[in-house]
Curated annotation (Swiss-Prot):
Protein name: Peptidyl-tRNA hydrolase
Residues at the catalytic site: 19 (proton acceptor)
Record carries keyword Hydrolase: yes
UniProt source species: Helicobacter pylori (strain Shi470)
Domain of life: Bacteria
Quaternary structure and interacting proteins, as annotated: Monomer.
Keywords, sorted A to Z: Cytoplasm, Hydrolase, RNA-binding, tRNA-binding
EC number from the UniProt entry: 3.1.1.29
UniProt family annotation: Belongs to the PTH family.
Length: 186
């Protein structure tokens, strides 16, 4: 089994903020597959079992995401872990993949690294840098950023669909990496 985790913060206060990119992409995937999340108090997360994947949205708040991930990872005895998360070191519209490595200062990844190790796959979605890291990651996208954000999130969702069917991280990485943002017609 593979644990596929979208990072974000629970509650309406943080809905659709830059830091909730992982939640939003998983929500879009679940909707397209005509599935739904259910809350698991055991893992303090919303989860959905689909094929041989456990899709998970930790409800611990970002800085404690590792608690939910570790709980689900141990319970389901998953072999692979893929984390979908925002990355402020990437421009808005960029989608990249990584296997292992550092957390880049991302508190959700720090929590996962501490409790689970840093040996997992990542789908990184660029949100660009802004003035003041905390304010920026907890802010919503500006209206003029929405078309590019939507295109990048759709691209990331399609990458996840490909991964669910192929179980091939390297093929997903080769096919879906966007080093530069997509061109959006106005």
């Amino acid at each position: 089994m593979t644990l596929l985790v979208g990072l974000g913060n629970p509650t309406l206060r943080y809905a659709h903020t830059r830091h909730n990119a992982g939640f939003d992409i998983l929500d879009s995937l679940i909707s397209e597959l005509d599935l739904s999340f259910t809350f698991s108090s055991k893992h303090n997360a919303c989860l959905c079992v689909y094929k041989d994947f456990i899709l998970l949205k930790p409800q611990t708040y970002m800085n404690l995401s590792g608690e939910s991930v570790l709980s689900a990872k141990n319970f389901y005895k998953t072999e692979e872990l893929l984390i979908v998360h925002d990355d402020l070191d990437l421009d808005l519209g960029v989608v990249r993949f990584k296997n292992g490595g550092g957390n880049g200062g991302h508190n959700g990844l720090k929590s996962i690294d501490l409790l689970c190790s840093n040996s997992y796959y990542r789908l990184r979605v660029g949100i660009s840098k802004g003035m003041g890291v905390i304010e920026h990651v907890l802010s919503k996208f500006h209206k003029n950023e929405e078309p590019l954000k939507n295109a990048a999130f759709e691209h990331a969702k399609n990458a996840l669909k490909f991964f669910i069917e192929s179980h091939d991280f390297n093929a997903m990485q080769n096919r879906f990496t966007l080093k530069k943002p997509l061109k959006i017609e106005s």
